[in-house]
Regions:
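Internal alpha-helical scaffold of NAD(P)-dependent oxidoreductase catalytic cores
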Residues: 120-144, 148-236
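Gly-rich Lys/Arg/Thr-decorated short loops/hinges at beta-loop-alpha junctions or inter-strand turns
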Residues: 65-75, 159
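A structured beta-alpha segment of the ubiquitous adenosine-cofactor-binding alpha/beta core
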Residues: 39-65, 95, 134
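Short glycine-/small-residue-rich Rossmann-like dinucleotide-binding loops
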Residues: 71-73, 108, 168-169
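NAD(P)+-binding Rossmann beta1-loop-alpha1 motif at the extreme N-terminus of oxidoreductases
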Residues: 1-31
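Short, well-ordered alpha-helix to beta-strand connector turns
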Residues: 13, 63-64, 160-161
Length: 236
């Protein structure tokens, strides 16, 4: 996921790919694909991509306007849950080094996860500033599910069936009143604009002219991804 998005976006924008494996970083900087994907290999050798790779996550995030998070979230059968620890490590570092950056999760995550992250950071900001009210700090996070096939990831980004971007929305009902207030404290005043910006970046890199773009709440976007995975698994 990460390599295909990096390749797609680097057609028109400066992109820094971050990895913890030196061999992969060296391969990307030598214009060789670290994964088996015919289109990525072709683009690396034939296109003038604005792409470089680094092991220094802190430095990369400090310079970024947008951080796309494609960390692994392997399913933990013992806990019966996705392991989101790597995603959270990235978010923690971005918030520390560049709190104004827009973050977009591309990893597969549980339904309700991004909403819980908003609540978690709202509480953290309140605790750090020792207040029960809103702080001046904002948390800019979106979720954009991917629908990619193995070894065809870049092709599926170049010719996407649809683009979906989830951004924070308030849930209806008295049970969610307090949660909505906390999320309102930290969410960007331009969350929908952020979602439209990221969707436009994906469209800009695609080769399809007529791509369906859908905007929805983060929880709905998470559900769409998991339902799509379930459908494909049952369609063997």
């Amino acid at each position: 996921v990460g390599m295909s998005i990096a390749t797609l976006l680097s057609q028109h924008h400066d992109v820094i790919a971050v990895d913890v494996v030196k061999e992969k970083v060296d391969m990307i900087n030598a214009r060789r694909s670290p994964i088996q994907d015919e289109y990525i290999e072709q683009f690396l050798t034939e296109k003038q991509l604005r792409l470089r790779a680094t092991l220094d996550a802190r430095s990369a995030y400090r310079e970024a306007d947008i951080v796309v998070i494609a960390a692994p979230t392997n399913y933990d059968t013992e806990r019966n849950h996705f392991d989101t620890s790597h995603v959270e490590e990235v978010i923690d570092l971005v918030v520390e080094t560049n709190p104004d950056a827009l973050m977009v999760i591309k990893s597969t995550i549980p339904v309700g996860y991004t909403r819980e992250l908003y609540l978690r950071y709202a509480r953290r900001f309140q605790q750090e500033e020792r207040t029960a009210g809103c702080t001046h700090r904002k948390f800019r996070l979106l979720f954009s599910p991917e629908f990619l096939r193995e070894s065809k990831a870049l092709y599926d980004n170049l010719y996407p069936s649809r683009i979906i971007v989830g951004y924070p929305k308030f849930l209806k009902g008295e049970a969610f009143t307090e949660e909505n207030k906390r999320i309102a404290c930290v969410m960007s005043d331009h969350a929908e604009d952020d979602a439209r910006l990221f969707a436009q970046l994906l469209k800009e890199g695609a080769m399809s002219d007529d791509v369906a773009v859908l905007f929805m709440g983060m929880k709905e976007a998470e559900a769409v991804k998991l339902f799509a995975n379930t459908y494909l698994a049952l369609r063997v």
